[in-house]
């Protein structure tokens, strides 16, 4: 199974570099030189090997092997990028999850009252923050004091909200 790891938002320069908005975790591994990515363009799967990777202004700047000119890559703007989910270089620790497993889960408080659904995840220096869309939009820190149970099979998360977290 493959997961979407980003989207090509634009090109950069004339030597075939692309700007990628990542919607994935483990970008330090996924975008390493030598990694194979699949770009889906007009319902066609195009495989590319990463030649270089750097981060600039919050975007991932990639070049692919064999692409040395803007004309070879410009037509891919707006295309989604995928990689195999069970990437051999990624080892999940206990209580560590793929973003794709968490996004879409329904979040409940410890009284089983539904709060909303996870729609996005932000990385911060200390911990990830989950964006929950319910009657309002909530920002929930992924810390042990708040997140009590994650059941990815049933797409269910139980939290114990800190005071003021859901106000």
UniProtKB/Swiss-Prot annotation:
Gene Ontology BP term (one): ribosomal small subunit biogenesis
GO molecular function terms listed in the Swiss-Prot or TrEMBL record: ribosome binding
Primary subcellular site in the record, as a coarse category: cytoplasm
SUPFAM superfamilies: PRC-barrel domain, Translation proteins
Residue ranges of domain PRC barrel in the record: 94-165
Pfam families (alphabetical): PRC_RimM (PF24986), RimM (PF01782)
UniProt entry tagged with the keyword Cytoplasm: yes
Record field: transmembrane: none
Keywords: Chaperone, Cytoplasm, Ribosome biogenesis, rRNA processing
Disulfide bonds, paired cysteine numbers: none
Superkingdom, taxonomy of origin: Bacteria
Cellular compartments annotated: Cytoplasm
Cellular component GO terms held in the UniProt record: cytoplasm; ribosome
Keyword Magnesium on entry: no
Domain notes: The PRC barrel domain binds ribosomal protein uS19.
Complexes and interactors: Binds ribosomal protein uS19.
Annotated function: An accessory protein needed during the final step in the assembly of 30S ribosomal subunit, possibly for assembly of the head region. Essential for efficient processing of 16S rRNA. May be needed both before and after RbfA during the maturation of 16S rRNA. It has affinity for free ribosomal 30S subunits but not for 70S ribosomes.
Protein name per the record: Ribosome maturation factor RimM
Source organism: Staphylococcus aureus (strain bovine RF122 / ET3-1)
Gene expressing this chain: rimM
